[in-house]
């Protein structure tokens, strides 16, 4: 195994960095989107009720990465794996019951669907499907669950869209809980992005006269004895502390997330007349549960919304992991490709590291338990070595197995070449990518030298990323539009 010179030391500060550089896009509701996608609500709460999906696995940290094979419905993800797009990172999204996921309100007729991109690929089209009127919400999502005639198709024109787009679509009439499948067909790869959206059509929800939802108690963390959790209630003139309710954690049992959520909701109902907390049943009765409890505000009270805050008296432990030694490129040799890494821990942690190729195949894994300050070597040998983009996914957990953070580092495997003399080219592609202009010469991965074409084609020379390689010299599907081969 041969390695190129290490250009930079790669350190991963997992508590301060989130998201992956190769991620792409997700259904959002930042501006005028009618509803957030299932994966999006794993990462951020709903913009009006603060409801959030839980127990989502690794996709919580990368909602933009629900990527899978294209061609739906003829090909694409298998039945039962549609929500995850067969991406192991998103496997939890395939769970399907009537009450598993947060549902966003919607009406039939014209609605806007919004996509937010972290990498705006050349696009073939977007398609939107909806479940059949008689679908079974307690069975895994399959092709038979959906009306396979998309109710909305938006042409992408084989160009890059803006970083945020909105599509006006005519949503068919439905009742109750339905799932909308939004498919973004990327034009420069053999992949598509699949976002399912859990929606509830108006007219079937329990009605509570004179009350509106203004927030929720979301049991996001366990608390320790001495900590407290309290409501912050806001009206038209700002926060009104007279409506605040505080729960002090006086036992380890009460500190469990679902327990304090139930206890706080119960205390709100005992102390307040303008606020009520709990799940609303079909009879219009609000009852606290051991889980997420919506908070309702009395109409005419002047109250607008409720937030949950904490007073943490215990010192929260610090967790951090640094990963050193990952090269940006590895040359494929006669022996198996090997990553020689060094791990340094802050706090007592568990780490799970997995190497994937761009097709999401797992090639190597490594697990370790590290104590505070421990430095340990880690060697990962890949099961196969093929040229192209690869990813090292690092997951850090505390000693109880709770995920602290996840991040992804990119690297490439390249074939060994005998390069021409360095005087014949300006850069080894993709070094100096942003500086390429007409006439720039680069040494490509096939060992040949290519020269950037004159305007107006020179703009294509800088359009490259590990997941968008259509203009890569000598390799991409459209490389000849940007480059001339010199030798």
Swiss-Prot record:
N-terminal signal peptide: 1-29
Occurrences of domain Chitin-binding type-3 (ranges): 438-479
InterPro entries referenced in this protein's UniProt entry, alphabetically: Cellulose/chitin-bd_N (IPR004302), GbpA_2 (IPR041029), GbpA_D3 (IPR054063), GlcNAc-bd_A (IPR020879), GlcNAc_Chitin_IntDeg (IPR051024), Ig_E-set (IPR014756)
Keyword Zinc found: no
Keyword entries, A-Z: Chitin-binding, Secreted, Signal
GO terms of molecular function: chitin binding
Localization per Swiss-Prot or TrEMBL: Secreted
This protein's GO CC annotations: extracellular region
Record SUPFAM superfamilies: E set domains
Major site of localization recorded for this protein: secreted
Stretches assigned to the Chitin-binding type-4 domain: 30-201
Purpose: Probably interacts with GlcNAc residues. May promote attachment to both epithelial cell surfaces and chitin.
Family the UniProt entry places it in: Belongs to the GbpA family.
PANTHER family: CHITIN-BINDING TYPE-4 DOMAIN-CONTAINING PROTEIN (PTHR34823:SF1), GLCNAC-BINDING PROTEIN A (PTHR34823)
Protein name stated in the entry: GlcNAc-binding protein A
Organism: Vibrio campbellii (strain ATCC BAA-1116)
Gene: gbpA
